[in-house]
Design a protein with these regions (language model features):
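Phosphate-binding core of ATP-grasp and ATP-grasp-like enzymes
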Residues: 32-40, 45-88, 97-117, 121-128, ...
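A conserved helix-loop-beta module that forms one wall/lid of the active-site cleft
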Residues: 1-15
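Short acidic/glycine-enriched loop/turn segments that link adjacent beta-strands
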Residues: 12-13, 49-51, 175
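Conserved hydrophobic/aromatic beta-strand scaffold that supports enzyme active sites
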Residues: 16-18, 42, 129, 178-180
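ATP-dependent carboxylate-activation loops
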Residues: 135-156
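Peripheral (often C-terminal) accessory segments that flank ATP-dependent C-N-forming ligase machineries
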Residues: 156-181
């Protein structure tokens, strides 16, 4: 069974290495150490399924919205996102599961009043967390939140940082996509 080794203080797929042969374990550990300032990392089962991402915002300790997005991925040693699109069609049950995972992660990491960027994988109808960070996503994801929901996401993040109570509710949605060339 393949494994994935992950640096815990990196992002953008840096320090994530798949290992198929346990005899290469030591060299893989040394490679992961190049991407971290910590003296530990995560080792987990390699999962195959449908990957998707999500943008979210946590305010007052509660997830205010979750916007699942599809990812355009460059496949090298590991997949690297090079673009995204919304909406990413998922059953409501899967979206609720992803939102619950986001809430649990935010609680565990003590994240509050911040954007959240998440990567998930869907395996046999179950949502697994690949990576979550207390930041807005890259590759035009903040702009896609603004376009999709028809509000200025940057303004909402600034309002929250100033201690205001921004309203993330929207009745409008505009499909959109962005990709690095």
């Amino acid at each position: 069974q393949p494994l994935i080794f992950k640096a815990v203080d990196s992002s953008g797929s840096r320090g994530i290495i798949r290992i198929d042969d346990l005899s290469k374990c030591r060299e893989t550990i040394e490679e992961v150490k190049k991407y971290t300032k910590k003296d530990y990392f995560i080792a987990e089962e390699f999962l195959e399924g449908e990957e998707f991402g999500a943008q979210a915002y946590i305010l007052g300790g509660k997830v205010q919205f979750i916007l699942p997005h599809g990812d355009y991925v460059f496949h090298g040693d590991t997949g690297v996102p090079i673009g995204h699109w919304v909406p990413f069609e998922l059953d409501e049950e899967i979206i609720n599961d992803a939102k619950e995972q986001l809430q649990l992660a935010a609680d565990a990491m003590k994240l509050n009043n911040c954007a959240m960027n998440a990567d998930f994988i869907l395996v046999n109808g179950k949502t697994y967390v690949l990576e979550i960070g207390g930041r807005s996503g890259a590759t035009c994801l903040s702009e896609m939140v603004s376009t999709y929901y028809q509000f200025d996401y940057y303004d909402k993040m600034i309002e929250a940082a100033l201690g205001e109570n921004p309203d993330f509710h929207s009745n409008d949605s505009v499909p959109c996509a962005a990709m690095l060339l």
